[in-house]
Swiss-Prot record:
The keyword Secreted applies. Pfam families: fn3 (PF00041). Residues 1-25 form the signal peptide. This is Fibronectin type III domain-containing protein 7. Gene3D superfamilies: Immunoglobulins. It comes from the Eukaryota. Disulfide bonds: none annotated. Glycans are attached at N230, N433. InterPro entries: FN3_dom, FN3_sf, Ig-like_fold. Residues 28-115, 116-202, 203-288, 289-373, 374-459, 460-544, 545-632, 631-715 form the Fibronectin type-III domain. CDD domains: FN3. Keywords: Glycoprotein, Repeat, Secreted, Signal. The gene is FNDC7.
Amino acid sequence: MAGGRETCLPLIGFILICLKMVASAKSAPEIPTIDQAYSKLSNSITVEWATVPGATSYLLTAEDGDTVIETTVANSPGTVTGLKAATWYEITIRSISAAGRSQASPPKQAKTVLAAPILEVSSPSSDSILVQWEAVYMAIAFSVSIMRANGLGSIWKENTTNTSLTFTSLEAGTLYTIKAYAWNANRIPGDDSTCNQRTSPRAPANIQVSFDSGALKASFSWARAEGAFNYTVMALSDSSELTCSTTFSSCTISSLQCGTEYLISVLASNDAGSSKSSSAMTLKTVACAPGRVTIQEDPPGHLSVAWSSVDLGDYYVVFVKSDDGLEVHCNTSLTQCNFLSECGFTYFISVFVYNKAGQSPLGDIFNYTTAPCCPSDINPVLVSSDRVEIVWSPVRGAELYETKAVDGYNMVECNDTTPACTLSALECDTKYNITVYSFNEVRGSNMSCTPQFITTAPCSPEIKNVSRDAFSMINVHWRSTNDDATYTVTAQGEKGLYQCSSTGESCTMRGLPCGSVFSVTAVAETQAGRSLPSYSVPLETVPCCPTGLTVTQITQSVINVSWTIGRVAQTHVAVLESHTGQSKCHTHQNHCLLGCITCGINYTVTLKAISATGLTADCSYQSYFSGACCPLGVKLYRLGPNGIRIYWQASRGSANYSTDLYGSKGIFTCTPSAGLSFCDVTEIPCGDVYTVMVSPVAKTGLKLTFCPKKIYSVTCSGSTLGMVIYRGKRNEE
């Protein structure tokens, strides 16, 4: 046991030595020593120290009693930021390695420099810059310097205890750099502030003005000012202010007022502000057009033009142009001009004012029309008994012509812009005094024109009655107020013209054809002329009878009656009548259908032709026998192995019949002997559908096909006929 304990002791000692060596290898790095701590910026302190072996980084700590700010840096020197300006800080440093961090170094006191002043700069004039700032904590003075931003020229530096400073004698429109910092009581400078400021430009020089009198606008130009970005031209008058702005050295102001004096000034501006106004110059525009223009013709043939005086006007020019293109004018410094004028002309008058700026704008153009002259070579032409057409040569200056016809008691008038007029609603067989007056809106009518006289044609007769007699003679009666007149009556139609004449109040016409329509008029004639025809009276002779009457049976109870329409007939009435009753139709066509016809009896056919006025002609009579009646109970029966029997019941009356079977494999027809009501088809294919029709046969041999059809199917039983099956009736197509 004792021997074992001696063996363990050396081993334990060896382990302790190893642990001590390991602990020694992982101990913290050395404590660094601060060489110096100083501040160049108001928010930071820079620290310098000797490098510690094995340290990978360093922890800088700044304390002001209220706050602690730490910063890790890689090596010396290092800077702690985020500090307060003009404040004492206790600075310590720790070295950091993989084994940990050292203890804090002995502290070092350092104070941050003063804060930079916050600058506000402006350019109150083109040669000065004003620098302003707020007071800086712990500052007792400030240094401010200025130089051109492009680096050319000298640097001006000023020290002051104030919070503002003005630099003068600078160049206009030039960009400067301003730098400022504060001092503390130890004359240690603080942070600096730097900013740029441009001086405002000088006012533009060499201003030139060009005035456009026609457009009432002015163009301005000037020499460019150093450092100017924009230019503004101002035109001031008593009633308005107009401006234009540009980046160039010219500008135009439009919408100037006539008769106005403007003060013109030009400003240059940049980001620093505007220059002083240039020396104001005066611009006088053209005078305004004269107002209150009056035109008078007194005496006739002399025009006097007058107007009111206008501002800024030196003299006046009046232009007078007639509508034939001739123009005259007068110049005067007064407010009136006189001109010669002629009748029948329209004059266009304008007044302008002139001054050194030019001609005034165009004012109102005035029209003045002198009285028109009388129309000449008037030619009245008789048109009818109640209408006269007047024509004449156009006259100068007339806008309208008034034509008046007077018979002593009544007056008829027409107005027109053309040299022609038709007087209507005149009294027939009357003497009129007809005068044409020229007229325009300004001067009215010329009442000195010479009248013309004319007598109208006789009055038109009035047809009172047109009658017919049994011998197709036409008697016409009329009434008229004319004296010593001869009357002619005319019947005009497609068949020709028929006339009769008389000096009395009636006449007779003979030989008018039937089926014709005539227009009957009467005309009176005297030495003054021929009257207008009377109002026409229609005359219609009885219509001619239709031809080609045809009766066709459509179905068992319906027939169609057709014919060729005779002259004048507009409608027809067809009547079928028998002992069983009557069937009638009234139509405007050349055919009609008559229903409810009884089969197998004799009818009397009557046709009437009726004109548009109701004249009727009984034109045609004919006997017609209606077709035989359709059989009843048509059926199909199997007849032996290959045959079919068609059976029916004969209806009223005796008739012959014909049977037809229509199938896809053929048509099969048979005709029974007289008096029989069945018929056999001995050979017919099975396996088909058949349409069966039994038709009466007229005495003429015509088969009537309007009877109903039935459908049967015939089946096969082996090679022979099978069942005969009824499928229904077939609709007519």
